[in-house]
Regions:
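Phosphate-end processing signature that detects enzymes handling 5′-triphosphorylated RNA
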Residues: 1-183
Length: 183
C-alpha cells in the first residue's frame, strides 16, 4: 500500500537537527494518508525518549485535513484529542510543512513478540505543495528500500534470522531526515 506523509518542522529545522545530532529526547509531527487519494488523514506525533520510541495519533476527516493544508487550523482547538491542541499551539509558534515523503509499504506481522516488519520501497520526496499530488515527487535514496523491525517485549529468533540480509546497513533511520536532503 502507498503511504504519503507531510512532515512539519520549525523555522530552525529543530526536528531534523535533533535527529541528525542523535538527541535523546525529540519529537516530530506529520500529516499522513494511505492510498492514492485521502479518505481521511492521520495527524501523528512521533517521539523518542531514552531510546524508546512512541507515537500519538489523531484522526482528521478529509475536510479537516484539507482545512489544515489551507492554513486553517482553528478547528483543532475543538477536537477532544490533546494531540490536536498541542499541534495547534506548535503551529502558532512556527511549526510549518517542510517536505513530503511517499513510499510503497509491504507489512508482515508475527504474533509472538507482536512483531511488525515493514519494507518501504519506491521512496520519493518533494515540496509540501505536492502532498495531494504525490505522483510528481522525485525518487530518493537511489532505489534503496528501508526495512523496519518493530516489536514489543522481545524479538523472536526466527525473525532475527529472517531479517539478516547481506549488504544491508543496520541503523536508526528517518525517512524524513533522508528525504530532506532533496529539498
Amino acid at each position: 500500500y502507498q503511504v504519503v506523509s507531510l512532515y512539519y518542522d520549525d523555522p530552525y529545522d529543530t526536528a531534523l537537527r535533533q535527529k541528525l545530532d542523535g538527541v535523546d529526547r525529540r519529537e516530530k509531527f506529520r500529516l499522513r494518508y494511505y492510498g492514492e487519494k485521502p479518505a481521511f488523514f492521520k495527524l501523528e506525533k512521533k517521539y523518542k525518549v531514552k531510546g524508546l520510541c512512541g507515537k500519538g495519533a489523531c484522526r482528521l476527516s478529509r475536510e479537516e485535513g484539507e482545512r489544515l493544508l489551507r492554513g486553517d487550523s482553528a478547528f483543532l482547538l475543538e477536537k477532544e484529542e490533546p494531540l490536536a491542541r498541542e499541534f495547534y499551539a506548535k503551529l502558532r509558534r512556527g511549526l510549518a510543512p517542510k517536505t513530503v515523503v511517499r513510499y510503497t509499504r509491504e507489512a508482515f506481522l508475527y504474533a509472538p513478540g507482536n512483531v511488525r516488519v515493514t519494507l518501504d520501497g519506491d521512496i520519493r520526496a518533494g515540496a509540501p505543495e505536492r502532498f495531494l499530488i504525490p505522483q510528481k515527487l522525485l525518487p530518493a535514496l537511489g532505489g534503496l528500500a528501508v526495512v523496519e523491525v518493530k516489536y514489543d517485549a522481545f524479538l523472536p529468533e526466527i525473525v532475527k534470522l529472517a531479517v539478516q540480509v547481506p549488504n544491508r546497513q543496520g541503523t536508526a533511520c528517518s525517512k524524513y531526515a533522508l528525504c530532506r536532503r532533496y529539498d
